[in-house]
Amino acid sequence: MQSYEPLLRAFSENHINYLIVGGVAVNLHGYPRFTNDLDILLTLDQENLKKMAELMDRMGYQQRLPVSIQELSDEQKARGFIEEKGLTAYSFIHDKYPQFNVDVLVAQSIDFEKFSKHTMRAEVWNIDVPVVSIDDLIAMKKNSDREKDIQDIVALLELKGL
């Protein structure tokens, strides 16, 4: 695996309901920068999470946490993981390709419907992929105080002409 291409193709072929966010979304909006993972939002219904878990397993990814991703389909449980355990992302790691980790942002996934209303579509490797809107991406990054997120906000605002 040389890129996220096989993963994005598999998401499409398996009808995973997701949105690309984070650094990859920044790139897809037109600001090239390095990122070492793929951040996504998922609909947290049981069927989508089951498909995701099975797909990631088939592709050689392991769940990083001692709980199944399917447990996030219970919104009360998901909020408990966030508030009591400090869970921000549910991570999948690949032993052979550690540079291609996948993080499911949990709190934002709870609000998937809100973010999906403004989705943009991008073509990557001849795959139609859903990407969070530039405005929603800026709003997500405003909740972080990491230097790279601040730089992303500046770059995204410049892309918008602001």
Question: Which residues does each PLM region occupy?
Answer:
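Compositionally biased terminal segments of proteins
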Residues: M1-L162
